[in-house]
Design a protein with these regions (language model features):
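Substrate-binding clefts and catalytic carboxylate motifs of secreted carbohydrate-active enzymes
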Residues: 1-98, 110-111
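Short, acidic Ser/Thr/Gly-rich low-complexity loop/linker segments typical of extracellular
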Residues: 45-50, 138-154
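Short, hydrophobic beta-strand segments
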Residues: 56-61, 145-165
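Short, conserved beta-strand segments of beta-strand-rich sandwich/propeller modules, principally
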Residues: 63-67, 102, 166-170
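Conserved structural position at the C-terminal beta-strand
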Residues: 70, 107, 171-173
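Short beta-strand elements
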Residues: 79-85, 177-185
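Short aromatic-acidic-glycine turn motif
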Residues: 90, 125-140
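Short acidic/proline- and small/hydrophobic-mixed sequence motifs that coincide with surface turns
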Residues: 114-117
Length: 185
């Protein structure tokens, strides 16, 4: 079913551009009459979004908070926020509800925020009754899915496992605190 409730979504992240660009194109998709974009609390203007198209701004990059607010008539009805994150310091494993054990491995900064542009090479291993079936990072990676190591893409790697008894899933990368997830069967 198509959703109709108001929604706004900032495409991408708000970390420094890898290419050093000073001006960053920001796209915002919205189900609202108009969208207003704010950088560190200062308005960058509004765009009409009633035609269902995205709104776009050319924003001078500055670290901090990028906030998009969607309006119906003149009332704010939805918002989306991106924050500049710090450097990755540790890995984190998150279980995803699924028919089979599925995990997302992410990088976190010192404040515990997901670093969306992190790209470390991550090695996975399992202990006990846990077996790694596949890994994937959603890019055009030529490494076969069954290989338990790969480079993170857009700050995430998916890990599929089989669990026959209690055990653990471990993620490790050079220079980062490893992650360990205990699984009880």
């Amino acid at each position: 079913l198509l959703r109709t409730e108001p929604r706004v979504h900032i495409l991408g992240h708000w970390n420094a551009p890898a290419d050093g660009a000073k001006i960053v194109p920001v796209w915002v998709y919205a189900r609202a009459d108009r969208v207003e974009l704010f950088l560190n609390g200062a308005s960058l203007g509004t765009r009409d979004t009633r035609d269902g198209r995205h709104a776009e701004w050319q924003v001078p990059y500055a670290p901090g908070e990028l906030r998009a607010v969607g309006y119906k008539e003149d009332a704010p009805v939805c918002e989306d926020v991106r924050h500049t994150t710090g450097k990755p310091v540790k890995l984190h494993l998150i279980p995803v509800e699924s028919d089979m054990p599925l995990f997302t491995c992410e990088c976190l900064d010192e404040a515990g925020r997901t670093v969306p542009d992190a790209a470390p090479y991550v090695r996975f291993r399992a202990e006990g009754g846990v077996r790694i079936l596949a890994t994937g990072s959603d890019n055009a990676d030529p490494i076969p899915p069954a290989v338990p190591e790969r480079q993170m893409y857009m700050g995430q790697i998916a890990v599929y496992a089989r669990v026959s008894a209690s055990g653990a899933l471990i993620a490790e990368a050079d220079g980062l605190v490893p992650a360990r997830y205990e699984i009880r069967a």
